[in-house]
Amino acid sequence: MPVIKGPQVFPRAEFLRRLNAVKLEMGRLEIDALIVGSSADITYLTGYTAKSGYVPQALVISSNDEEPTFILRRQDAPAAIHQTFMDRDKVIGYSEALIGNPDKDGYDAVVDFLNERDGANKRGVGVQLGYLSVRSAEKFKTRLPSARIVDCTHSVAWIRMIKSDLEISMMRDAAAIADAGVQKAFEVIRPGVREADVMADVAAQLARGTNGKAGTDLASMYFCSSPRTGTCHIRWSEDVIRDGSQINLEIAGVRHGYVSAIMRTFSVGAPSDRLRRIHDAEVLGLEAALSTVKPGATCSDVANAFYRTIEKSGFQKDSRCGYAIGIDWSEPTASLKDGDMTKLKPNMTFHLMLGNWIEEDFGYVLSETFRVTEAGCEVLTKSPRQLCVI
């Protein structure tokens, strides 16, 4: 029996709008075909969220075709038929003989598809070279010898940086789920409780969702507890929570690929003077950064508003203050850092990430996900900006 089409997260017209924007960029670059390998970009253009990108797969966009063609491993083709907006004949499953083959892989199936189309090997072809191994990139060049290969690694990412209102609604739902995860952490972090049990409850909340909207995936979760608060990307340990512990939590809600992230710091018992001082300074810095957000301001403006504010309290932050966020946790485009002159536009979304790792054994975290509005910003995450004292 053929697999049925699943419920579509966005209407067909929304996907066609996105594809048309990509085709305009293809015209500017004078390419007739674009090979999209980024899983996040494929989600944006088709609605596909299955985790099959660990083997070669590609979305082929032709300037002459309304719908793209998705070429992926044959066993994953039913998921693509089920999840995407495209007709089933636009999903092509390649043979299992290309899996674990030292001589050929799924990208050979993509090149074969291009070569089967009239003139495909003689026109401009855009390829996301940054996502390919050297060997795979070379394959496109040698097997399409007459084609002008154009690197389009981040072309789609820059287009999807400005969200539609439908996408913003999805990110609001994801932000509410992230907030529910923070609240759950506040409820279950207690002395004597295993860190693993805390995160099991938080993960369950992130999957369960809130307001009738389920979390559709689990993003990475970071639980950096004393004496590991100077680290930023480690998981929970096998230890238990103790009186006097500090916990730096970073989680995200996910709705159909769209991510809204949040960070909060917890103190089990009275916080130290140092922790309270950096918390107070960073809240002021966060408010200064958010007050700078408006169309026409630059990412650098936002970052420097934060840096200048915390410096008045004697603190510095060496790392960037955030990054574009949307499909997947971090979009490979703009950063909230000194010198990034990307101008803010309405419906851009960012994770204002103010984690500050001061010493090897001490750091602090605070963050919000926000969108740029016509007049300023809307903070999507709503958890209180407090030092969460247990």
Curated annotation (Swiss-Prot):
The entry's keywords: Hydrolase, Plasmid
Taxonomic superkingdom: Bacteria
CDD domains: APP_MetAP (cd01066)
Entry's EC annotation: 3.-.-.-
Keyword flag Manganese: no
Similarity section: Belongs to the peptidase M24 family.
Protein name: Uncharacterized hydrolase/peptidase y4tL
Natural source organism: Sinorhizobium fredii (strain NBRC 101917 / NGR234)
